[in-house]
Amino acid sequence: MVVQNSPVSSVHTANFSERGSNTRTMTYKNKLTVCFDDILKVGAEMMMQQQLKNVQLDSYLVNGFSQSQQKLLKEKVKLFHGILDDLETSLSQSSSYLETLTALGKEKEKEREEAEKKRAEQENMRKVREQEELKKRQELEEASQQQQLQQNSKEKNGLGLNFSTTAPANTTDANGSKENYQELGSLQSSSQTQLENANAANNGAAFSPLTTTRIQSQQAQPSDVMFNDLNSMDISMFSGLDSTGFDSTAFNATVDETKGFDDNDSGNNYNDINISSIENNINNNINSTKNGKDNNNESNKNNNGDEKNKNNNEDNENNNNSSEKNNNNNNNNNNNNDDNGNNNNNNSGNDNNNTTNNDSNNKNNSITTGNDNENIVNNDLPTTVVSNPGDNPPPADNGEEYLTLNDFNDLNIDWSTTGDNGELDLSGFNI
């Protein structure tokens, strides 16, 4: 059986070959396209041989394509499928790689956004901190300026002289402080005098001229009581003195045939004077005086409560009369201190009667103390007041423990040494 092929098929085949050649020139060359072109070429050749075979009249002829062509076509088809598999693998790997890159890009973008956010927050915090510091600095500057203005205003007010408003108050304060100072001085002097007289009376000794002069000087200057702190004296340089006793040989000197401490057989009593007790008594008197200073217009009412306080204040003369009347008390304490025309008469008695009369020619020392009891000690010994310039006591015999000028002369010291040979320069000590 002979099969005739129409010429249309051959024309179609030629046109297809031309289109393939035109398409081949337009495509991009790579493995896949080259393999695909080879497959198409082998297939086209096999189809041409098959058509030539069909044209022949003998039907027993073999197929139009040979075995080698079939093998080549098979290899090309396998290669094409391998290339497609490799392409699929590459595409999958590329997609995964792209996905990984996309995830990494998103993470980086997220981190960048977070970093920018943190940076913005830190910048905001820094700005807020700077604003707070600036505000605090401004507040401190304003406070310092206000303080400086207040200080300047205070200084200006302090330097200003407003006599119309401040003069009466200052005058009143000055008068009150002056009265308090006078009262304090009189009470301190009276307490000091009473303390010394009481100690002398209890020890049974008479007053020497030294003691009389000392009492008068303390009455004349009541402010010296504040400088009688015995514990502040440094007596370490005097080897003969200690805290419990004194050497009575320095007090044996008498003036104008008067009696000293040893003439009354009571010299040993002065070795037992307790300095701390005297100091405590003085401090108690001063403290009681200071506490009583604030209660200037108040008096203690005892027994019948009949007390009269009269205060008359004038320009240069202030008379303070305080009277307290009790049942069994008829003694008065009169302390006369002339200071700027101030007369202070204090008559007090809490069942305690004290009479002290200090005159320049007084020869009797009377002390009256007691609670409903009157103890009067009259020292009838002759006492003579020695007029010593500056209220200084007469020199006394210091004994053998003190060096004199003759002792220095006995040392044969060359006071003219100038220190030229490395010796001590004594020229400045030459007497």
Swiss-Prot record:
What compartments host this protein?
Answer: Nucleus
Q: Which InterPro entries match?
A: Mediator_Med2_fun
Q: What does this protein do?
A: Component of the Mediator complex, a coactivator involved in the regulated transcription of nearly all RNA polymerase II-dependent genes. Mediator functions as a bridge to convey information from gene-specific regulatory proteins to the basal RNA polymerase II transcription machinery. The Mediator complex, having a compact conformation in its free form, is recruited to promoters by direct interactions with regulatory proteins and serves for the assembly of a functional preinitiation complex with RNA polymerase II and the general transcription factors.
Family to which the UniProt record says this protein belongs: Belongs to the mediator complex subunit 2 family.
Q: Which terms are listed as keywords in the entry?
A: Activator, Nucleus, Phosphoprotein, Transcription, Transcription regulation
Protein name (record): Mediator of RNA polymerase II transcription subunit 2
Note down the stretches annotated as region Disordered.
105-178, 284-399
Keyword DNA repair attached: no
Pfam families given for it?
Med2
* Miscellaneous: Present with 10785 molecules/cell in log phase SD medium.
Q: Where is the composition biased (Polar residues)?
A: 162-178, 366-387
Question: Which residue ranges have biased composition labelled Basic and acidic residues?
Answer: 105-140, 304-313
Kindly list the GO molecular function terms attached to this UniProt entry: RNA polymerase II-specific DNA-binding transcription factor binding; transcription coactivator activity
Asked if RNA-binding is a keyword of the record, the answer is no
State any GO BP term from the record.
negative regulation of transcription by RNA polymerase II
Q: What is the lineage of its organism?
A: Eukaryota, Fungi, Dikarya, Ascomycota, Saccharomycotina
Q: Which residues carry this modification: Phosphoserine?
A: 6, 208
Query: Which GO terms of the cellular component aspect does the record hold?
Result: core mediator complex; cytosol; mediator complex; nucleus
Q: What species does this protein belong to?
A: Saccharomyces cerevisiae (strain ATCC 204508 / S288c)
Q: How does it assemble?
A: Component of the Mediator complex, which is composed of at least 21 subunits that form three structurally distinct submodules. The Mediator head module contains MED6, MED8, MED11, SRB4/MED17, SRB5/MED18, ROX3/MED19, SRB2/MED20 and SRB6/MED22, the middle module contains MED1, MED4, NUT1/MED5, MED7, CSE2/MED9, NUT2/MED10, SRB7/MED21 and SOH1/MED31, and the tail module contains MED2, PGD1/MED3, RGR1/MED14, GAL11/MED15 and SIN4/MED16. The head and the middle modules interact directly with RNA polymerase II, whereas the elongated tail module interacts with gene-specific regulatory proteins.
Principal location class? nucleus
Taxonomic superkingdom: Eukaryota
Instruction: Write out the biased-composition intervals (Low complexity).
Output: 143-152, 318-365
